[in-house]
Amino acid sequence: MKNTMKVLTAMLAILLLSLNLSAFAQSAEKSYTIGIAQFAEHPSLDNCREGFIQGLAEAGFVEGENVTFITQNAQADMGLTQQIAAQMAQECDLVCAIATPMAQAAFNACMDQGVPVVYTAVSDPTGAMLADADGKNAKAITGSCDLLPVEAQLKLIRAFLPGATKIGILYTTSETNSESQLKLYQQHAAAYGFEIVPAGISTGADLSLALDSLLPNVDCLTNLTDNTVVSYLAVMLDKANAAGKPVFGSEIEQVKNGCVASEGVEYIALGKQTGALAAQVLGGTFAGEIPFVSSQGGEMTYNSQVAAALHITIPEAEQARGMDVAQK
């Protein structure tokens, strides 16, 4: 009897193993249509998209082999954001939503269709109602968070501008991620001897006038991961440079393009993290059971040419630990 039970147990184990291997093979052989829905076009979000594709490829999901990508950009248009989300909910096996407004739209459009969503470049998933307090969600959504290292940025600004007292922050009033980050700056600024002077805008068209009012009353500007504001970085830099006021960026591409320095997020790496999450979902894990992940931090970057033009002396300690991204 014991021998019979051993044989039956062994046969059952072999059967289960065969079924698992068969399921894995079917998953590997299946072809997926993945939507990449991007809220706006600027380097941070572009890098997220590229990193996402790279992260999926590293996990074995390669464009042209077992993945077809449908990529659309809403150009910061809220109406178009809703349309893209609704279309992808009908056409895709999984949607990667880039930036908070797109993530919220994709969540609303995809949940009733049973299409999983993986978001990225969302600074406050809980505040945006995309995750519970424990980082999970009962529905098929997960993703990655690009919350800024606010205290590190304040420390950086203090090192670059020892005599500064007021930091200006432009933000879009309809972006929940921006409001969350602004509150963090307001909470921590006093500990570093700063006062935050905020200026809210509704659209990019408001940015120029807001800068005209803000710049005379601050020593510098620092950027959030605000999609509308960052999309108008060239306008911000033109006006700030004319006023002799430095702009501190929220990631490396902004520093390459004219901000003086940043302790911000490395978005290629964040996109890769998101691609790895998507691979888990495509492999059969329910998205809502995967807690969102946070950015793993990036290297401090500075632009020595911008600093020189603004007569800012970069401390040796900051030069030693950071990376100069000036175009030489």
Task: Report residues per predicted region.
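Short hydrophobic alpha-helices and adjacent helix-cap/hinge residues
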Residues: 3-8, 26-328
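Bacterial N-terminal signal peptides
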Residues: 10-20
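Juxtamembrane cytosolic interface motif at the C-terminal end of transmembrane helices
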Residues: 21-25
